[in-house]
Amino acid sequence: MTHPMVLQLRFTRSEFMRALRGISDEDAGKRFLPMNCISWNVGHLAWQEQSYFLYYAQGQMLRPDIQEAFAYGGPASTPSLKEMKSAWKTITAAVDPWLDSLTTAKLQENVISNGKPINYKYGNLLQRVIYHYWYHLGENMAIRQILGHERLPVYVGNIDDKAPYQPEQADNPTMQ
């Protein structure tokens, strides 16, 4: 059984992508200072998932170009939305099997970096990613409003059907 926190991440990802529907590559590359452009934000979240769930969790670096160009504090740029969505899809698809394997016990483990445990736990990283998506989703929607886009998606979509609250099940060994 997939951990409830992972289900929340998946819903969050789907909402992030839903908020990009109908935007042109040109508009996604427009920057309103001090914000980054929408396409950069997509690359940035691909960077975070790759860093946390591929590199820290599995020792893999699938897209070094994403690591260099979209890290926290990285240089502003206006990449192609199509290219960033492709990178995001590649990275999230590679992350998913690890996410599917998560248990409550694993989420409580300290992250290992350079062979040593650090202060973060995998559960903390998962929460950071979820909240980070919502931050940039809001930023992206603000940019779309500035651009004059209309009929934008409504906040949190169909959460009741797609991501209802699910308690951890103490008697379920996959959650332990």
What are these regions (language model features)?
Residues 1-5, 74-77:
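Short, charged, low-complexity loops and linkers
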Residues 6-10, 17, 25-71, 113-176:
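Short, contiguous alpha-helical
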Residues 9, 13, 20, 88, ...:
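Hydrophobic alpha-helical core bundles mediating ligand binding, dimerization, or RNAP-core interactions
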Residues 21-28, 104-107:
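Short, flexible helix-adjacent loops and helix caps
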Residues 73-113, 121-135, 175-176:
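Acidic/histidine-rich alpha-helical segments that form the ligand environment
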